[in-house]
Amino acid sequence: MSSGSITTGRTSGLLTLAIGALFYSSGSIARPDLQPLGPNIADKGSAFYHFTQRQYDSADGERHYRVWTAVPDKAPPAAGYPVLYMLDGNAVMDKLDDAFLQQLFAGSPPVIVAIGYQTALPFDTAARAWDYTPPLKTHEPRAGKPALPPRKTGGNDVFRQLLTETMVPQTEANLKIDPHQRAIWGHSYGGLFVLDAWRKASLFGIYYSASPSLGQALQSPLQASQSLDAVRFRGKS
């Protein structure tokens, strides 16, 4: 396992390449622009997919989510659609376009579920810092470095419970989904969440952890993975 990405050969190569082309060539996630977003593909409409939205609130009422579900306008395979859950859903939806969806549609297109927040911005930085990070060890600031105001972190177990017990079941309730092709993708803090979910969650079989944030205080998922029982993770990739 590396800090670059966790991918799989089980999903289509086209999907893997398309994700890379969409997000890394543009630098849209690595160098985010925090300006308000305009209409996205769900607002404009697609010739290949149809979109629905759901809204959720965290149990403490502090965070508010918007979840877009894109379903191919094509009958599912006998085993069901593959499904890809993507964190930072506002930024994802801003970059999706019909040319990309047409590429997916030409093969065995997945259902795409973009999990974002109820904001006009591409990222809710405070919410994702809490939702995507594990409980952190406290570190003193380096000598000569001013201490920054703390950002609330460490809530990924709470968010993962909302994701796996509420969002996923409600999203898939009326869809024919292949559970063996259920994937999750995240970048930076989102990649850290995916890395930790690989250790802890059994719902997903395929994990895309792209450039996970592994700073000094965020090493715990990677360190814990070094001593895992391989048998326990058979069937995950």
Each predicted region: which residue ranges?
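Bacterial N-terminal signal peptides
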Residues: 16-24
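A domain-start/cap signature at the N-terminus of enzymes
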Residues: 28-81
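Serine-hydrolase catalytic machinery in alpha/beta-hydrolase-like enzymes
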Residues: 79-162, 166, 170, 174
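Alpha/beta-hydrolase fold nucleophile elbow
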Residues: 176-187
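Conserved hydrolase catalytic core segment
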Residues: 196-205
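The feature captures the conserved acid-bearing segment of alpha/beta-hydrolase catalytic domains
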Residues: 211-237
